[in-house]
Amino acid sequence: MSIVNSVRAQIPPIHREGYPFVGGFALVTLILFWIWSPLGWIGTVLTIWCAYFFRNPARTTPVRDGLVVSPADGRVSMVVDIIPPPELGLGAKPLPRVSIFMSVFNCHVNRSPVAGRIERIVYSPGKFINAELDKASEDNERNSMVLSTEHGQIGVIQIAGLIARRIVSFVREGQPLVAGERFGLIRFGSRLDVYLPEGTKPLVAEGQTAIAGETILADLKGGDAGRIYRTD
């Protein structure tokens, strides 16, 4: 029994958004096995990949006041100062922005970068160009959220990409979130932008690998006081 529990501990659960996809792949796989077994094995591989894509692992989040953690797994594709999109309502001055690109191999469950209350959620229809391009932040379909914290407002934008055609949000305006709490998901490759308060110095660099709920993007308080961690 201990061996079984050990194996289970190493396999993350599937997010509920993935149930229809994994179930569909599994059904097709059974049909393929009935038609011709080699096709069934191909279907098995695709079913396992689909389950892997929708994995929903626990993460250990540092929850000290002022820390901003990554909202997504992926690669830090841009760290720039840029004027935020108007739908965020964060003004017309350039703000620090950290962009994280998620490939189809990354976990796509998105987590709140800070503890705060959701002031605004705005959905914007748009195109589906390559999410790595800078103009994707303005041209692509996206879901924008503003979080109010003791240290200012944080903007978080889920951006669809070439393959990602479905942005899912689990939250509503006025809802409080804790750092690292799951708030959404984007299917099959995309990007997350985080807008930080003016004067904030990002602690990550372009090309760095980020882990949702764990990698620290910035420290709004400065310094490096002791941290407390929460696993979820």
From Swiss-Prot:
GO annotation (BP), single: phosphatidylethanolamine biosynthetic process
Note accompanying the cofactor annotation: Binds 1 pyruvoyl group covalently per subunit.
Cofactor dependency: pyruvate
UniProt membrane topology term: Peripheral membrane protein
Site (Cleavage (non-hydrolytic)): G189, S190
Catalytic activity: a 1,2-diacyl-sn-glycero-3-phospho-L-serine + H(+) = a 1,2-diacyl-sn-glycero-3-phosphoethanolamine + CO2
Active site: S190 (schiff-base intermediate with substrate)
Entry protein name: Phosphatidylserine decarboxylase proenzyme
InterPro entries: PS_Dcarbxylase, PSD-A
Secretion signal, residue range per the UniProt entry: none
Similarity-based family: Belongs to the phosphatidylserine decarboxylase family. PSD-A subfamily.
NCBIfam families noted in UniProt: PRK05305.1-1, PRK05305.1-2, PRK05305.1-3, PRK05305.2-5
UniProt subunit comment: Heterodimer of a large membrane-associated beta subunit and a small pyruvoyl-containing alpha subunit.
